Every structure is written in C-alpha cells, then in structure tokens.
C-alpha cells in the first residue's frame, strides 16, 4: 500500500515536469517552433478550435513558420487570431498560406520571457510540493490505521522527500535550459 503511494507520487511528479516542458515549448525563444501556436484558438463554425487542428504547421526555415489551413476559408480567421494573440508576430497572407517570420528578440523581451519561464517553473514546483504533501498525508493515514509502523512512516517520508528533491532538480534543469535558449543571441 505504501509503495503504491510512492509510485503514484512519482507518476504525478513526472506529469508535472512534462506539463512544464509542454508549457515552456509554447514560449517563443527566437526560433520558429510549431508549438508556439499550441495555445492559439480560432472561432470555427461557432466553436473555438486550436489552430494546429485546422492547419498544417511547418518550419521551412529557422525563423519562419508556414501555416497551411486544410480549409482555405479560415485563413483570414487564423490571421486575425495571430494578430490578436500575445505572440507579437505579424502573419504574411498570400491567399493560400500564412507565413510567420520570427524576428530576433529584443533584450527587454528576452527578460520578460525569462520572467515568464521562472513563473511557470515556480508553479510546477508548487504542484510537486502539493503532491509531496498529499503523499505524506496518505502515509500518515496508513500509519494511523496500523498498516505501517512509525519507522516505515519515517522511511517512506524520506523516500517521498527524495522524489520531491529529484523532481525539483529536474524542473530547475528544464528551466535553466529554456532560459539559456531564450538568452542565446
């Protein structure tokens, strides 16, 4: 039973790390990346639809995204959504595809993005700490019910702390890599 608590906690912490990686992938780092448009939705027949489900997104060059909608009638809607978004990009519409040129980031914009990365990382760390708290509470319940001894509680508590430390270290590494990518000129 207590091993299950550790296994579940490890899985949840891994998911928190993966969620952070996905979230950081949507932050522009001066290079073209199709995941930049992951959070972008377009009103399509009355329903908000993610752009990546309405169009093929490719990266023909290091600083260029090419958006080819499956239905050409939504080209204008996708263009409007990009202009309204906080991406700071201006699409070039040639009637059948949209080209997004990714400009060099200014020093000021880089610093803003690093702050955003740190905020996302802190949220991931809070999630991991909450998972640790839940695991410790579950272990205390097991000890109270007599399923594990006090020594087992202490031992498993240390294991949960090791998992937490490892997960936070991974989050720090993910964050450091993304910051380096953003600050790279």
From Swiss-Prot:
> Protein biosynthesis: is it a keyword of this entry?
yes
Domain of life here? Bacteria
Cell compartment(s), UniProt: Cytoplasm
Q: Does the keyword Protein biosynthesis apply?
A: yes
Keywords for this protein: Cytoplasm, Protein biosynthesis
GO CC, sorted alphabetically, is:
cytoplasm
GO MF annotation terms? ribosomal large subunit binding
GO aspect biological process, one term: translational termination
Principal location class: cytoplasm
Q: What does this protein do?
A: Responsible for the release of ribosomes from messenger RNA at the termination of protein biosynthesis. May increase the efficiency of translation by recycling ribosomes from one round of translation to another.
* Family per record: Belongs to the RRF family.
Q: What is the protein name stated in its UniProt record?
A: Ribosome-recycling factor
Originating species? Listeria welshimeri serovar 6b (strain ATCC 35897 / DSM 20650 / CCUG 15529 / CIP 8149 / NCTC 11857 / SLCC 5334 / V8)
């Amino acid at each position: 039973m207590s091993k299950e608590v550790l296994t579940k906690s490890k899985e949840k912490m891994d998911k928190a790390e993966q969620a952070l990686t996905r979230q950081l992938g949507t932050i522009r780092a001066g290079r073209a990346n199709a995941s930049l448009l992951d959070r972008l939705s377009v009103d399509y027949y009355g329903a908000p639809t993610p752009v990546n489900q309405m169009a093929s997104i490719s990266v023909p060059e290091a600083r260029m995204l090419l958006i080819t909608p499956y239905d050409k009638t939504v080209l204008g809607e996708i263009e409007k959504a990009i202009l309204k978004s906080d991406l700071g990009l201006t699409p070039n519409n040639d009637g059948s595809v949209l080209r997004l040129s990714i400009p060099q980031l200014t020093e000021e914009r880089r610093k803003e993005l690093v702050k955003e990365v740190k905020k996302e990382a802190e949220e991931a760390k809070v999630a991991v700490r909450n998972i640790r708290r839940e695991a410790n509470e579950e272990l205390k319940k097991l000890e109270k019910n007599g399923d594990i001894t006090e020594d087992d509680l202490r031992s498993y508590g240390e294991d949960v702390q090791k998992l937490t430390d490892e997960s936070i270290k991974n989050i720090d590494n993910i964050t450091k890599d993304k910051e380096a990518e953003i600050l790279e000129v």
